[in-house]
A protein has these predicted regions:
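Terminal, low-structured helical/coil segments at or just beyond the last alpha-helical repeat
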Residues: 101-137
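Conserved alpha-helical positions within TPR/SEL1-like repeat arrays
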Residues: 25-43, 73-87, 121-131
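Long, intrinsically disordered low-complexity tandem-repeat regions enriched in serine/threonine/proline
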Residues: 1-4, 8-12, 73
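Flexible helix-coil transition and linker loops at the boundaries of alpha-helical arrays
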Residues: 14-27, 62-75, 109-118
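Ser/Thr/Pro-rich low-complexity tandem-repeat tracts
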Residues: 9-12, 33, 57, 81
Length: 137
């Protein structure tokens, strides 16, 4: 039921985003819909489909972050996408590590600039996930 609801929401958000591509909030909402669909698919055991949804979310967030690099929320959203991909076992370890490092670096940069909200300081979570990965060869 949740997946069907998220897909219905995605269809609406896709329509809105197409109507006004300059509306960054609608673009962000679209990325959130893809992420939520990925979350449900992952729980259902469909890693490859979750990966596809997470990649779509990442693509939207990369576009927003490029469009307005000074927007801390877009950067945090991008870090979240990196975390989702970095913790998805459907990816090879090297790719997971690269996503986790990228996301952690994004958060560190925002924090160093004094723009990371304490509630969004997930650098420790990135470090914990990196520590779980097998050592790089």
């Amino acid at each position: 039921a949740a997946l069907a609801a998220y897909r219905a929401s995605l269809a609406i958000r896709e329509t809105l985003a197409r109507r006004d591509p300059a509306n960054t909030e609608w673009q962000r909402d679209l990325s959130i819909s893809h992420e939520k669909i990925g979350n449900v698919l992952l729980v259902q055991g469909n890693g490859p489909a979750a990966l596809t949804a997470y990649r779509k979310s990442l693509a939207s967030r990369e576009t927003l972050a490029r469009r307005d690099p000074g927007n801390a929320q877009w950067q945090v959203d991008l870090a979240v996408s990196c975390y989702k991909l970095g913790t998805t076992s459907a990816l090879p370890v090297a790719e997971r590590r690269a996503f986790l490092l990228r996301g952690r670096d994004i958060l560190k940069q925002i924090k160093a600039a004094g723009r990371l909200a304490p509630a969004q300081d997930w650098i420790g979570e990135f470090d914990a996930e990196l520590a779980k990965l097998p050592a790089a060869n």
